[in-house]
Swiss-Prot record:
NCBIfam families in the record: ATP_synt_delta, PRK05758.2-2
Subunit structure: F-type ATPases have 2 components, F(1) - the catalytic core - and F(0) - the membrane proton channel. F(1) has five subunits: alpha(3), beta(3), gamma(1), delta(1), epsilon(1). CF(0) has four main subunits: a(1), b(1), b'(1) and c(10-14). The alpha and beta chains form an alternating ring which encloses part of the gamma chain. F(1) is attached to F(0) by a central stalk formed by the gamma and epsilon chains, while a peripheral stalk is formed by the delta, b and b' chains.
Protein name: ATP synthase subunit delta
Pfam families: OSCP
């Protein structure tokens, strides 16, 4: 198991280098879209992540697989960066590098990530309303929603923005009421 501080020491320089490279080349939006694609592919195919993380697989085999999977899908500079991660035996941190890149990208654009949990899926109008309220609350220029469902909430919404949690769920209200009555 790798500690989070060690992972951060490994992940941050690569993510920052990707942001710097993309910015210097005027490719921030391209890299962002490509990194979202890479993260989705790795998440959708656990075998790919296991293959890339395996210390038994040679770097050359990993680079060949990266070439086959991503060559026609992502920018060549980003593909070369993935190959560099493989050469440096850091490809097992690919998911974390992608996440950190997206965090840095949001920070550059003054966009906040709001993790929204509801009992049932939100309509587009509800999502837009939450975006507007979060934008007003945070003074950010944009809001990226990450939605999930939890039927145990019974109703309402829980919004997490960074380390702040806004619990407007029925479950949360019932819990607070029970604490007041106790």
């Amino acid at each position: 198991m790798i500690s989070s501080t060690m992972a951060a020491r490994v992940v941050d320089p690569y993510a920052e280098a990707l942001v710097s490279l993309a910015s210097a080349q005027g490719l921030l939006d391209t890299f962002e879209a490509d990194i979202r694609f890479i993260a989705a592919v790795v998440q959708a195919t656990p075998e790919l992540g296991q293959f890339l993380a395996s210390p038994l697989v040679k770097a050359e085999a990993k680079k060949n697989l990266l070439q086959q999977v991503f060559a026609d899908q992502i920018h060549p500079l980003l593909l070369n960066a993935l190959k560099l991660l493989s050469d440096r035996r850091r490809i097992m941190f690919l998911g974390a590098v992608c996440q950190r890149f997206l965090e840095l990208q949001r920070k550059l654009k003054n966009i906040v990530l709001a993790e929204v949990t509801t009992a049932v899926p939100l309509t587009e109008a509800q999502q837009q309303s939450i975006r507007e309220r979060v934008r007003d609350f945070t003074q950010a220029s944009g809001v990226e929603l990450q939605t999930s469902q939890d039927p145990t909430l019974l109703g309402g919404v829980i919004i997490k923005i960074g380390s702040q949690v806004i619990d407007l769920s029925l479950r949360g209200q019932l819990r607070r009421l029970a604490l007041q009555l106790a």
